[in-house]
């Protein structure tokens, strides 16, 4: 839940040391945390395994015409805001509905209403009845390990070890 996420981020170094997730600089500043960036994950979509586009290996933006696209509300991060701005200005044939947060309720709604959810990642899925499909665009979002801006010695050593592995 959003409340759980806020609680975790507010207590780095006290109740929890690290968590993985997507972020932008404004998010880190607002939440008072830091991040070790591991990758730029593609921004893609998730849709029902029964959706008319589910058989495609990659979608074009024009494939979304006439569809309802679920997108995290404006202000969550600059990367999804850029997508929203492009869809609104260049592709009015796509209906956008806001979602507050990516959670089980949103994934269930995506599947049951046969919508398309703008999602993040390199494969797999978080819902058994949804399929993640890439979109032919260049949008990505930083993914990494979120932590306290002043991590403990143990956490610092862990972050350094992970950084070495990812820099190879």
Question: Where do the PLM segments sit?
Answer:
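Central regulatory/effector-binding core of bacterial HTH transcription factors
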Residues: 1-27
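Short beta-strand-to-loop elements that line the ligand-binding cleft
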Residues: 1-3, 91-103
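Secondary-structure junction motif
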Residues: 66-90, 155
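Flexible hinge/capping segments at coil-to-helix
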Residues: 30-43, 47-69, 156
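Beta-alpha-beta core module
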Residues: 30-36, 40-41, 104-153
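Structural motif
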Residues: 1-2, 21-24, 48-49, 72-76, ...
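Extended ligand-binding regions for polar small-molecule ligands
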Residues: 62-66, 142-168
């Amino acid at each position: 839940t959003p409340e759980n996420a806020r609680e975790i981020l507010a207590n780095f170094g006290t109740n929890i040391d690290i968590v993985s997730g997507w972020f932008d600089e404004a998010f880190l500043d607002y939440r008072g945390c830091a991040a070790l960036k591991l990758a730029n994950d593609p921004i893609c979509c998730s849709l029902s395994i029964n959706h008319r586009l589910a058989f495609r290996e990659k979608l074009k933006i024009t494939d979304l015409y006439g569809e309802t696209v679920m997108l995290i509300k404006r202000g969550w991060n600059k990367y999804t805001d850029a997508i929203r701005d492009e869809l609104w200005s260049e592709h009015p044939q796509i209906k956008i509905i806001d979602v507050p947060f990516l959670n089980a309720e949103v994934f269930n709604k995506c599947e049951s209403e046969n919508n398309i959810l703008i999602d993040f990642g390199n494969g797999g899925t978080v819902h058994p009845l949804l399929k993640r499909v890439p979109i032919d665009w260049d949008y990505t979002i930083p993914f990494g390990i979120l932590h306290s801006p002043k991590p403990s010695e143990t956490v610092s050593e862990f972050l350094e070890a992970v950084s070495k592995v990812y820099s190879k």
